[in-house]
């Protein structure tokens, strides 16, 4: 029986935060998720004197996407002086408000978008199956290259285990935080739980990983699906525990109060023994993270400059060292290769959705 997807009423809030020497800009942004109110907060940071390029991040302050965009801007501004990168948070609809805004800008506008795979999954599902209203076309975004490759981790509280979570999912269902319904987090964990004969409900309205994690801390959800960076400190303190890596490779790197641990996976040699042995969960593993994108039709010279800068950023230890420190992955694709990878990922997401029917 096809699970019913409930319509969402999201309060879209736009928080504008300029990273490098740019005062905040207030205003209202209309998106498919509703009207967005603006709150401005500016950081005292010296501009490098270059032409301003905004990196529009559709996720909340303190989450991995936000921190990554800021590290990227910081690194790029130190490596060259032709462009001054600033970060603007435009929240609402787990990225939909920002994507809609970006798609309606003139193609010559020198903005970049944090363009994640999960956003594209929801876009394609909405366009194909009508799962939600989509007021933008993802072909209006043109990826420069990948900046974020992550392994989703399922976290819970120390009083729970993977076994207890699976049992609860099969007997009434569990609540999760981590994006909106049918985002990559939900498609991955949701399809896995469905294959196990259980149910997952996404508690939405959180903007970014920091708020989603707090939902678990506050007892509003049973599990939080987030990045390695998002709950690293809580794992070290013993207040949250990682119970499953949505990967086919054992995840190493977490340190608990009792020492280093290895997080089991959904497939492969390190598959968690609590999962059904006769079920192949490899289709639940989807690419996670994303790209920075220009407008489709943007000036080619500008795109070439952005590509050159991205390659320099990835080659700089300030960026790749930070990526390694928060246990994200150094994964680089550019231009057409990045677009092809994204399109292939969306095909996999449509197949994962079949498990939710």
Regions found by a protein language model. Give the residues of each.
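Flexible hinge/capping segments at coil-to-helix
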Residues: 156-174
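C-terminal lobe and pocket-closing loops
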Residues: 235-314
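Short coil/turn segments
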Residues: 60-62, 117-118, 152, 156-161, ...
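An extracytoplasmic/periplasmic, membrane-proximal ligand-sensing/linker region
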Residues: 50, 194, 236-237, 298-357
């Amino acid at each position: 029986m096809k699970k019913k997807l409930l319509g969402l009423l999201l309060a879209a809030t736009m928080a504008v935060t300029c990273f490098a020497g740019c005062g905040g800009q207030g205003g209202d942004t209309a998106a498919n998720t509703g009207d967005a109110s603006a709150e401005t907060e500016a950081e005292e940071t010296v501009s490098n004197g270059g032409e301003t390029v905004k990196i529009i991040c559709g996720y909340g302050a303190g989450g991995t996407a936000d921190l990554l965009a800021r590290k990227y801007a910081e690194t790029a501004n130190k490596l060259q002086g032709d462009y001054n990168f600033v970060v603007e948070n435009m929240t609402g609809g787990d990225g939909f408000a920002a994507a809609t805004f970006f798609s309606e800008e003139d193609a010559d506008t020198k903005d970049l978008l944090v363009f994640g795979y999960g956003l594209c999954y929801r876009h394609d599902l909405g366009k194909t199956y009508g799962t939600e209203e989509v007021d933008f076309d993802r072909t209006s975004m043109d990826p420069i290259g990948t900046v974020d490759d992550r392994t989703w981790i399922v976290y819970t509280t120390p009083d729970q285990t993977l076994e207890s979570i699976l049992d609860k999912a099969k007997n009434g269902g569990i609540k999760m935080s981590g994006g909106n319904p049918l985002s990559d987090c939900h498609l991955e964990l949701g399809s896995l739980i469905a294959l196990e004969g259980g149910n997952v409900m996404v508690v939405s309205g959180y903007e970014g990983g920091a708020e989603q994690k707090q939902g678990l801390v506050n007892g509003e959800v049973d599990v939080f699906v987030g990045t390695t960076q998002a709950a690293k400190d809580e794992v070290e303190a013993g207040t949250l525990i990682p119970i499953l890596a949505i990967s086919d490779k054992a995840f190493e790197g977490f340190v608990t109060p009792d020492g280093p641990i290895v997080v089991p996976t959904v497939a492969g040699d390190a598959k968690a023994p609590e999962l059904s042995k006769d079920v192949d969960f490899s289709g639940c593993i989807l690419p996670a993270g994303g790209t920075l994108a220009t407008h489709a039709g943007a000036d080619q010279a500008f795109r070439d400059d952005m590509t050159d800068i991205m390659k320099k950023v990835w080659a700089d230890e300030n960026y790749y060292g930070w990526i390694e420190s928060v246990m994200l992955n150094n994964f680089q694709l550019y231009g057409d290769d990045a677009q092809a990878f994204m399109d292939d990922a969306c095909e996999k997401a449509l197949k994962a959705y079949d498990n939710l029917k």
